[in-house]
Amino acid sequence: MKLNPSKCVFGVTAGKFLGFMVSQRGIEVNSEKVRAILELEPLRTVKAMQSLNGKVAALNRFVSKATNKCLPFFQVLKKSFEWTDECQKAFEDLKKYLSSPPLLSPSMPEEELYLYIAVLQAAVSAALVRDEGSLQRPVYFISRAF
């Protein structure tokens, strides 16, 4: 195996890995990906809506009940595109949530994990968490629409 020295980093406590910020504290969302969503204006075209959905999909593991939060966006794509008040509220709520996204905690081998499942009318969501003292820290979020 050959390593490219200019691409190698040794002895660091944090860094970008596969698009995420990894540190001793856990896995953080890449701030550039969040900024791309936070700086968006209300969407005017189907293409812009598809772009937003792609950006949110890249951050799904950090967003609790992501499908439920983004359901108005999916519904607009199925019909003729119209930015509704419901879309605007969902967009603002998503921006508010992403302004302070959770830190995902790494799990340890043989550690006991807990899975919380929420079944809603149009989506199912799950949160994988671990105990850290008296707190429960998120490990991973997942959600799907019906």
Where are these regions (language model features)?
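Secondary-structure transition/capping motifs at alpha-helix termini
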Residues: 1-3, 129-137
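A short beta-strand motif that forms part of the nucleic acid-binding face
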Residues: 42, 130-132, 145
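Eukaryotic short linear interaction motifs
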Residues: 17, 123-124, 135
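C-terminal reverse transcriptase regions that engage the nucleic-acid substrate
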Residues: 1, 5-112
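A short, polar/acidic, helix/strand-boundary loop motif
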Residues: 134-146
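Conserved beta-strand elements of beta-rich interaction domains across eukaryotes
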Residues: 34, 81, 120-122, 146
